[in-house]
Amino acid sequence: MHLDQLLRDIPAKIYGKVESIPVRNLTRDSRCTGVGDIFIARQGQMCNGNDYSGQAVENGAIAILSSLYNPFLSVVQIVTEDLTALEACLAARFYNDPSKRLDVIGVTGTNGKTTVSALARELMEYKGRCTGLVGTIEHILGEHRIIDSFTTPDAILLQKYFAEMVKQNLSSAVVEVSSIGLALGRVRETEFLAGVLTNVSLDHLDFHGSFEEYVVAKKQLFVSLPEHGVAVVNSDCEYAQSFLEISPARGVSYAVHQEADYRAVNLKFSSLGSTFDILYQGNVFSCETSLVGEHNVYNVLAALSVVHQILGGDFAELVHYVRYLSAPKGRLEPVLSGPCPIYIDYAHTPDALDNVCKILSQLLPADGRLIIVFGCGGDRDHSKRPIMAKVAETYGFSVVTSDNPRTEDPDQIIADICSGFSTDRYVIESDRRLAIVKAISMALDKDIVLVAGKGHEVYQIFKHQTIVFDDREVVCEALASIY
């Protein structure tokens, strides 16, 4: 695409002569800017992109998109008050509005986004729809798989990923949509066909400032749905109705504890999985899955509901296929070589930890003990730290350790957590590797060990370095050294 085409009729002030020259790329990183690129000078958390516009021009940028005019730059400048909106607009235009050529499902909620997204994608594939995935663990763009640190990529990358999906002849995409991604405009200009709400509980208050603003951010996905789209909500969530009320799309519900369009009843759990019946339009459909726990029944229901609403067809066939689905990496993932059951899970919010501990406690023998290794991330919501302790001590014995401390003092984070304990059913070991060893060493064959918080992650972030750290590998190493 040429510069004059890209900038035609955009709501911005343009300084300099806009010529018909090819645009190679859009980028936020001045270091990666090359000849023919447009540099987006955004104000970030750590630095101001406007400070690097000169470097971008030296590297070959043909235009700068910013909220400020710089009289010392010799290239075209695109100046707008709403940089977020225009960045998303240009990204979509540059990649020829790829989301309009895909059936895009957006999944939002405090917990369960990754599992619901993965299950929905697998069900779509089973029904013959080549489907991409944008999510926490990986982005699947047809034959290409990308690992990224963001649940929802920035607007430029997201449109680029959609374009690659179209190029690979995919017809659908499932996107994990975080509240932060919504608030930062990362999914602006993405045309969603469906939205799924998993649940809403305490998270990301460090970013949003209040729980009310957190909910408002999540609602943006449902406001953006078209009238011919579908809004799928968990009716057991107290906020579900408010999401349906603000959405132009057709509302569909799923639930376990109350009436809904898709309702699960007769739930039974074991270490091998879950069985339940689904009530839909007066019929009963028996469902079995290798995924364990009530929270995973919700996840399965959400995936089934949205896929069935989009594709239609034989619901019984779709339900039957659920038995072949598996949980994403790091979601209540068992490690099979230990003296007692050991699970790794991404649970890093109070609700998520409660869900996982609840099901594992149900799998314990009467004289067994649940041993929980967990910490809390640094530079994130402080208020949930003592709440995590209260949840953990309800179910078992805790080994409190470090998660991703980031720029904070790990010992202070641990102190914040421990302020929530009302008993002495915990020990402290700030070194996560040693904490895992300690938990496994104290476990008896009738116990269960849960290593929570990091799940699929293969790194640990400290103030001055990021190290390789995989909970699963550390568990296996600990088992090899102990037994």
Swiss-Prot record:
SUPFAM superfamilies: MurD-like peptide ligases, catalytic domain, MurD-like peptide ligases, peptide-binding domain, MurE/MurF N-terminal domain
Pathway(s) of this molecule: Cell wall biogenesis; peptidoglycan biosynthesis
Residues annotated with N6-carboxylysine modification: K218
Binding of UDP-N-acetyl-alpha-D-muramoyl-L-alanyl-D-glutamate, residues: S30, T151, T152, S178, R186
Annotated keywords: ATP-binding, Cell cycle, Cell division, Cell shape, Cell wall biogenesis/degradation, Cytoplasm, Ligase, Magnesium, Nucleotide-binding, Peptidoglycan synthesis
Keyword Oxidoreductase among UniProt keywords: no
Binding-site residues for meso-2,6-diaminopimelate, renumbered to this chain: R380, D403, N404, P405, R406, G453, E457
Post-translational modifications: Carboxylation is probably crucial for Mg(2+) binding and, consequently, for the gamma-phosphate positioning of ATP.
InterPro entries: Mur-like_cat_sf, Mur_ligase_C, Mur_ligase_C_dom_sf, Mur_ligase_cen, MurE/MurF_N, UDP-N-AcMur-Glu-dNH2Pim_ligase
Cofactor(s) required, per the database record: Mg(2+)
GO CC terms in record: cytoplasm
Motif (Meso-diaminopimelate recognition motif) on chain: 403-406
Recorded superkingdom: Bacteria
Known catalytic reactions: UDP-N-acetyl-alpha-D-muramoyl-L-alanyl-D-glutamate + meso-2,6-diaminopimelate + ATP = UDP-N-acetyl-alpha-D-muramoyl-L-alanyl-gamma-D-glutamyl-meso-2,6-diaminopimelate + ADP + phosphate + H(+)
Matching Gene3D superfamilies: Mur ligase, C-terminal domain, Mur-like, catalytic domain, MurE/MurF, N-terminal domain
Pfam families linked: Mur_ligase_C (PF02875), Mur_ligase_M (PF08245)
One example of a Gene Ontology biological process annotation: regulation of cell shape
Coiled coil start-end: none
UniProt-listed PANTHER family: MUR LIGASE FAMILY MEMBER, UDP-N-ACETYLMURAMOYL-L-ALANYL-D-GLUTAMATE--2,6-DIAMINOPIMELATE LIGASE MURE HOMOLOG, CHLOROPLASTIC
Function, as annotated: Catalyzes the addition of meso-diaminopimelic acid to the nucleotide precursor UDP-N-acetylmuramoyl-L-alanyl-D-glutamate (UMAG) in the biosynthesis of bacterial cell-wall peptidoglycan.
Record-given protein name: UDP-N-acetylmuramoyl-L-alanyl-D-glutamate--2,6-diaminopimelate ligase
Organism of this sequence: Chlamydia muridarum (strain MoPn / Nigg)
